[in-house]
């Protein structure tokens, strides 16, 4: 019996967990696995991304044990974003020209930050807070900056604000809801700027 060609698009927390579970549950050697990851490093813990500013390294945040992909015969294509899925020919095409055929396809692309369509949002010093590369860029910009503004007063926005403050910037949070963490808190609970 030939191996099932499985392509996983996305090497974030969910994509990596899927692969771990598949390896644990599937018959050994059943799948020929290829994983596309748009970022330049293997899966890492985004939940604790803010700890990167407190002297943790990208290796500290890694979810991948050394040698994991080689041990399981997984082809990992880092820095390759999928640009096209050809369902008729069952092919995945990357931004680097790699074409991989599949029998089974898993899309584990995660989420993307919403950037409000406001003037200046495309400026080179306007950042999102999603990847280690984003945090590296924020840290670099903070070296010559005096203040920073975070748009969004939810949990991640407040984490970003804490990071800017820790980098020595005067920090401001802009939130569209009448209270901070509106999505996380219920009813009578409320956090104001004075509480932060």
Q: What are these regions, as identified by a protein language model?
A:
Residues 15, 157-158:
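N-terminal Rossmann-fold NAD(P) dinucleotide-binding loop
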Residues 1-7, 64-149, 172:
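FAD-binding core/adjacent interface of flavoenzyme oxidoreductases
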Residues 2-75, 163-188:
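Beta1-alpha1 glycine-rich phosphate/pyrophosphate-binding loop at the start
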